[in-house]
Amino acid sequence: MKIYKVDKTLVSTNRIAMMEHKPLLVVREKDGGTPQVAVDPVGCKPGDWVICCGSSAARDATGVKGYPSDLTIVGIIDKWEVPQDADTTS
């Protein structure tokens, strides 16, 4: 599992049927980091710090075996101090 920050929502209305209508979010490991798409089954909003899992754990976390995801949000962090030496510039 890794910690990410939610950057913004991602709108994709035309999807394969298996993806259903689960929300998709753009997340980054740090400000200015590479954007990644994560499935959001927990209800996050931009600016939230979240815990994500990847690989087969990401598929299992959606609740649908074989779901086409390699990054899924599994929790919203209530309180977390960003380390002082972390690059948080945008």
Swiss-Prot record:
Keywords: Bacterial microcompartment, Carbon dioxide fixation, Carboxysome. It is found in: Carboxysome. Residues 1-78 form the BMV domain. The keyword tRNA-binding does not apply. CDD domains: EutN_CcmL. One of its GO terms (cellular component) is carboxysome. Pfam families: EutN_CcmL. Induction: Induced by growth in low levels of dissolved inorganic carbon (at protein level). It comes from the Bacteria. InterPro entries: CsoS4A, EutN_CcmL, EutN_CcmL_sf. The tight homopentamer forms a pore with an opening of about 3.5 Angstroms in diameter which is positively charged. Probably forms vertices in the carboxysome, a polyhedral inclusion where RuBisCO (ribulose bisphosphate carboxylase, cbbL-cbbS) is sequestered. Has been modeled to induce curvature upon insertion into an otherwise flat hexagonal layer of major carboxysome subunits. Belongs to the CcmL/EutN family. CsoS4 subfamily. This is Carboxysome shell vertex protein CsoS4A. It comes from Hydrogenovibrio crunogenus (strain DSM 25203 / XCL-2).
